[in-house]
């Protein structure tokens, strides 16, 4: 037989929604927007690293970081 604990009582509401699925696509579009924004962020970082995106007064030489 399982024993009731205070932590179990606190976490029980989180588990009460187990197995329930929202109808339709739900919030999939929100996830798609955030994935798109993250992709753009990574693309900008890659372009700065490759010096394809030139920014004024920003030197990407890693040797300058040791000074």
From Swiss-Prot:
Q: Which SUPFAM superfamilies match?
A: Photosystem II 10 kDa phosphoprotein PsbH (SSF161025)
How does the annotation summarize its subunit structure? PSII is composed of 1 copy each of membrane proteins PsbA, PsbB, PsbC, PsbD, PsbE, PsbF, PsbH, PsbI, PsbJ, PsbK, PsbL, PsbM, PsbT, PsbX, PsbY, PsbZ, Psb30/Ycf12, peripheral proteins PsbO, CyanoQ (PsbQ), PsbU, PsbV and a large number of cofactors. It forms dimeric complexes.
Q: Reply yes or no: does the keyword Amino-acid biosynthesis apply.
A: no
Q: Looking at the record's lineage, which domain of life comes first?
A: Bacteria
* UniProt-recorded name of the protein: Photosystem II reaction center protein H
Give me the segments passing through the membrane. 29-49
Q: What does this protein do?
A: One of the components of the core complex of photosystem II (PSII), required for its stability and/or assembly. PSII is a light-driven water:plastoquinone oxidoreductase that uses light energy to abstract electrons from H(2)O, generating O(2) and a proton gradient subsequently used for ATP formation. It consists of a core antenna complex that captures photons, and an electron transfer chain that converts photonic excitation into a charge separation.
User: What Pfam families does the record tag this protein with?
Assistant: PsbH
The membrane topology of this protein is:
Single-pass membrane protein
Similarity field:
Belongs to the PsbH family.
Q: Which UniProt keywords apply?
A: Membrane, Photosynthesis, Photosystem II, Thylakoid, Transmembrane, Transmembrane helix
A single GO CC term, please?
Answer: plasma membrane-derived thylakoid membrane
Q: Name one GO biological process term.
A: photosynthesis
Query: Is DNA-binding included in the keywords of this UniProt record?
Result: no
List locations, semicolon-separated: Cellular thylakoid membrane
Matching InterPro entries, A to Z? PSII_PsbH (IPR001056), PSII_PsbH_sf (IPR036863)
């Amino acid at each position: 037989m399982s024993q009731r604990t205070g932590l179990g009582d606190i976490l029980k509401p989180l588990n009460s929604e187990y197995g329930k699925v929202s109808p339709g696509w739900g919030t999939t579009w929100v996830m798609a927007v955030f994935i798109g924004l993250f992709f753009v962020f990574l693309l900008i970082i890659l372009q700065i690293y490759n010096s394809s995106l030139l920014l004024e007064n920003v030197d990407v030489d890693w040797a300058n970081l040791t000074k």
